[in-house]
């Protein structure tokens, strides 16, 4: 008799048992790409950060770590307003910088990043979150913040330099497009790494003047009631205090370095041109939209 694996009891009853059903497949686990997962993690960190750790103390620590590079014969006069960090998702650097700038305008009603993005998309200023037009950035700020904005053209020197420094010493933000190096600092790539930063403050190296000294860092000081006006400061060196959407940290950039970077934005990155995505680039390209352009913001009541 041929061998069988059937249950004898089932054979006697004349019943043939069906094989057990196959096990269900394991549930699919959808993993975010590493860059997206990292971005979302740092965005969460930024949203829950304590201003005391991201503000003055962090900036002072950075200045102290770089103190050996500064001219020890100068007094270092710091103007800065705390600005919260926000990590961008995708090419949202300009809109994230705008959101950060809005925090310095004492707005009656906060404008969430999503509101800013939706406004930019609906008006045809952006497709992916990119902003290749400083003029559109100035108009967008008026619409979402209800503030005043001023578009500067012709670079960061000359008359514009005075306007930028006056803005920063008044505690108001400046948005600057520039080419971003791998450490997020300004570089010169002819616009291939175009990026946006918000400038929240300025560090002057000055010869003399009456200022309030920092209790912890020799040579670092702050403006006082009897400090000389900006026009009367004997300024020898200038650094800008910056934040941008790829880092939680403040950065300190030489004025001339970011000025040179801002003034050579002329081409769209060829990799971006061929990546299959749609981007909104103004007539005249990156050169017409960003090169040598800066945006200043003020509350309407100023």
From Swiss-Prot:
GO terms for biological process: protein processing. GO terms for cellular component: cytoplasm. Residues 85-205 are annotated as: Peptidase C39-like. InterPro entries: ACTMAP. It is found in: Cytoplasm. The active site is at 93. It comes from the Eukaryota. Residues 1-26 are annotated as: Disordered. GO terms for molecular function: initiator methionyl aminopeptidase activity. Keywords: Aminopeptidase, Cytoplasm, Hydrolase, Protease. Pfam families: ACTMAP-like_C. Its EC number is 3.4.11.-. Belongs to the ACTMAP family. Actin maturation protease that specifically mediates the cleavage of immature acetylated N-terminal actin, thereby contributing to actin maturation. Cleaves N-terminal acetylated methionine of immature cytoplasmic beta- and gamma-actin after translation. Cleaves N-terminal acetylated cysteine of muscle alpha-actin after canonical removal of N-terminal methionine. PANTHER family: ACTIN MATURATION PROTEASE, UPF0692 PROTEIN C19ORF54. This is Actin maturation protease. It comes from Xenopus tropicalis.
